[in-house]
Every structure is written in structure tokens, then in C-alpha cells.
Amino acid sequence: MTVAETLAVLKSEKDIEPSADYAGEENTDDFILAIQTDKTKQTKESAWIVCADHVKEHSGSLNASTTDEAFIRTGTVTTKTGTQRTLAVNGNRCVGDAFQDFVLSHKIKYGTGKDVIVPYVYFSVRTGKGEIGSASLVVTGDVGGAANAPATFAVDVKAVGTPKDFNYLTDVTA
């Protein structure tokens, strides 16, 4: 499902749409993670593929890099040198889901370097605010699970560089 299709479903079924005036709680279901799987056909973010079907989690973390230096009469000072966004995605395998089929393709599972870097967007469906950038897709599990249990998958979406500020309300036209 695309970003535009997902937002249309949320509007019609739950009366949820991005609003600059939204104030209140957000839950995990209020965030969209989408990637561009075909740069020739998906030229706008609204056409990118959403990570959702049979996905149990897409947890974001910010991993800071630091250096420690000791100075005379000051002591140790920690300097933040960078931050990398990581989105940990996992769920039950669903063949035919465009997101899963792409991230679990042979090209991505065994790819390296620029072959596994894709544009991504991560934003709130309540406010439209989030981030956009490029990320490496690192598949950490393609078929997990115990006997008689659903097959599972896991992938880390690791930002390359610093993502840009994103606002669906002002940056995207369907």
C-alpha cells in the first residue's frame, strides 16, 4: 500500500489525517514508515510503499556517537559527534506485501553498499511531521519462528547521514 492509499484509508475508516493543529497523544500506529522501491514509478513520497502489513513493530532509535577527552582542571568532557537514526522493523512474513517482498528480496538480503540504500520517509499521521532521507536496509532475519508458528522477519532501516526535516502537509502533493 502506498502512503497516499494509507492516508486515504485512515481518513475514511478512522477519520485521521495530518493536521498542523493537532495536539494530543500519539501512539505507534500514528507513524508511517515508507520507502521508495521503484525510483522510476515512485517519484513522489505519496507513492512510496508503506511498512505496515503484518508488521508488529517499527521502533525508532537515535544512536549518538561521542568522543571523550580529558582536559587540565576541567576533567573529562563528552562531545557528541553525530547521531544515526535506526528503525527496527519486525513482524510476520506476508508474501505479496510490497514492502516485505522488496526488503526480503535477494538483492536486498545479500546486497552491499549503494545497492541496499533507499530513500525513506518517517512521519506522524497526526501532524504530518517527521523526517526524510536515505537509509541502508539491513535484513537481520528473513525466516524465523518456531514449529507451527508464523514465519517472522526483521530488518533494520539505518539512516545514511542526517535526515531532513519533513512535513507531509507542505512537502508532498499527491
Predicted stretch roles:
Residues T2-N90, S136-P150:
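Solvent-exposed edge beta-strands and adjacent loop segments
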Residues H54, R93, A159-G161:
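Secondary-structure transition/turn motif
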